[in-house]
Design a protein with these regions (language model features):
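Acidic/glycine-rich phosphate/pyrophosphate-binding loops and surrounding catalytic core
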Residues: 1-170
Length: 170
């Protein structure tokens, strides 16, 4: 899928960016010892992508959290379908949820749109390929999501192959 250390660094950076010195709202609203169960459900029909990334965000923030995937990457989900459950410290769940949801929503969106294009060209002798035009730091996730949607990866980075464009022929 991807080098473990790359995903770990991406998640740590995302959590550091969002949490900073701490989640002041959760700290003010909770005692800190509450436990709970969170459920992630699909708000619309979609193609799942990034479900393990979603879980890894919670586990990175708090290894004691228990994550259970209910759908796998590449599967279709209908509106209201259960995608995953997270149980444990309510403070940890609330602190990690926005980063986890942002990554999951982005990846599912890419996979869903890719699948729509792949379905449109079914039966033709062509493939849907991605590009390097991704948000900095999120390329591994974006390209993974394309594959989950049935598309193919082109070049991962500049080192990955020669592609002469008009900018090179000046």
């Amino acid at each position: 899928m991807w080098p473990r250390h790359v995903l770990t660094e991406l998640i740590r950076n995302a959590l550091a960016e969002d949490v900073g010195a701490g989640d002041v709202t959760t700290g003010a609203a909770l005692r800190g010892d509450e436990t709970g169960l969170a459920r992630a459900t699909a708000k619309a029909e979609l193609v799942v992508a990034g479900i393990e990334v979603f879980g890894e965000v919670f586990r990175t923030l708090d290894p004691a959290l228990v994550f259970t995937a209910r759908k796998r990457d590449g599967e279709k989900a209908g509106k209201g379908d259960l995608l995953a459950e997270i149980s444990g410290s309510l403070a940890s769940i609330l602190t990690a949820e926005r980063v986890a949801l942002n990554l999951l929503q982005r990846m599912c969106g890419i996979a869903t749109l890719t699948r729509r294009y792949v379905d449109e060209i079914a039966g033709m002798r062509v493939k849907i390929l991605d590009t390097r035009k991704t948000a900095p730091g999120l390329r591994i996730l974006d390209k993974y999501a394309v594959r989950a949607g049935g598309g193919c990866n082109h070049r991962f980075a500049l080192y990955d192959g020669v592609l002469i464009k008009d900018n090179h022929i000046a």
